[in-house]
């Protein structure tokens, strides 16, 4: 990845981005490393009520959330942050965090700087058949959807490395 190359301007509508189902979430890829020359990625997520992400740490990426619709509680170093439509939450790299969805659903924008984590998502989900939440009975993917292994993704995009921690403090 050559970050000295200049990215090109682009526009993508959330009805056009590549969509994936996994972990009960609809993931819409709005910007990936290829689009931004590795600078950042941006994903729109539709998430149902309940625990959304267990405690984890992104060692090499900053992460932000902008709540478009609904309500969520983020746990940053175990401290709760209530977020509603219009809220922006910033998580510095190396910070333990988790979150849960308090409303029926949440629609949010999730950004990673630098890019890379989106490939972990694409490798562990399946292409969505509709722009809706996945069916509750959907089985876990049997194989990676990416041509890269997890190790290759982390090697190519160090920002994809995530440490998942035990326990849910929320």
Regions from the language model: what does each represent?
Residues 31-32, 52-59, 100-101:
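Short histidine-centered beta-strand/loop micro-motifs
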Residues 107, 119-139:
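A hydrophobic, small-residue-rich beta->alpha segment in the mid-to-C-terminal subdomain
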Residues 36, 73, 93-122:
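Ligand-binding loop in jelly-roll beta-barrel domains
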Residues 42-49, 57-76, 111-112:
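Short, conserved beta-strand element in jelly-roll/cupin
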Residues 29, 42-46, 64, 80, ...:
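Conserved hydrophobic/aromatic beta-strand scaffold that supports enzyme active sites
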Residues 11-13, 78-96:
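Short acidic-glycine-tyrosine-enriched beta hairpin
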Residues 1-39, 137-170:
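A short, N-terminal "cap"/entry segment at the start of jelly-roll beta-barrel domains
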């Amino acid at each position: 990845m050559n970050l000295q190359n200049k990215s090109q301007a682009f526009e993508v509508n959330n009805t056009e981005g590549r969509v994936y189902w996994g972990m009960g979430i609809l993931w819409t890829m709005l910007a990936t490393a290829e689009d931004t020359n590795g600078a950042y990625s941006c994903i729109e997520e539709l998430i149902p009520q309940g625990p959304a992400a267990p405690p984890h740490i992104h060692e090499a990426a900053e992460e932000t959330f902008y709540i478009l619709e609904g309500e969520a509680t983020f746990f940053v170093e175990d401290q709760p942050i209530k977020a509603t439509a219009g809220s922006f939450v910033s998580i510095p790299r190396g910070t333990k965090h988790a979150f849960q969805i308090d409303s029926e659903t949440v629609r949010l924008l999730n950004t990673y700087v630098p890019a890379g984590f989106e490939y972990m998502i694409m490798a562990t989900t399946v292409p969505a058949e509709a722009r809706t939440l996945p069916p509750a009975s959907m089985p876990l993917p049997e194989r990676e959807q990416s041509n890269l292994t997890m190790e290759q993704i982390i090697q190519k995009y160090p920002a994809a490395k995530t440490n998942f921690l035990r326990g849910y403090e929320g």
